[in-house]
Amino acid sequence: MANHSSAKKVVRQTIKRTLINKKRSSAIKTFIKKVMYEISRGNKEDANLALSVAQSKIMQGVKKNIIKLNTASRKISRLSRQIKNLHKSE
């Protein structure tokens, strides 16, 4: 446990930041799940709309240092590829 007041403040700040980051990370995962749901339904238009929203949220997460840029790019690329393959299958 921290003894100095400045160390106690750092602990409080860390707890606060951790909660905020978990909330943002959870939101990103939720938007990705929405895209996956639309892909599983085979709904191209809704999947594209969900992807555009998810892409925005993912890149906001990069800006806030929730996830790394390469991870975000990989997730967006894989979702886009799945939607593209959905177009080909029909």
Swiss-Prot record:
Question: Which terms are listed as keywords in the entry?
Answer: Ribonucleoprotein, Ribosomal protein, RNA-binding, rRNA-binding
Q: Does the keyword RNA-binding apply?
A: yes
InterPro entries from the entry?
A: Ribosomal_bS20 (IPR002583), Ribosomal_bS20_sf (IPR036510)
Which Gene Ontology cellular component terms are annotated?
Answer: small ribosomal subunit
Keyword Phosphoprotein carried by entry: no
Q: Give the Gene Ontology MF terms in alphabetical order.
A: small ribosomal subunit rRNA binding; structural constituent of ribosome
Instruction: Please name the GO terms of the biological process aspect recorded for this protein, alphabetically.
Output: translation
Function, in words? Binds directly to 16S ribosomal RNA.
Similarity annotation: Belongs to the bacterial ribosomal protein bS20 family.
PANTHER family (alphabetical): 30S RIBOSOMAL PROTEIN S20, SMALL RIBOSOMAL SUBUNIT PROTEIN BS20C
Protein name per its UniProtKB record: Small ribosomal subunit protein bS20
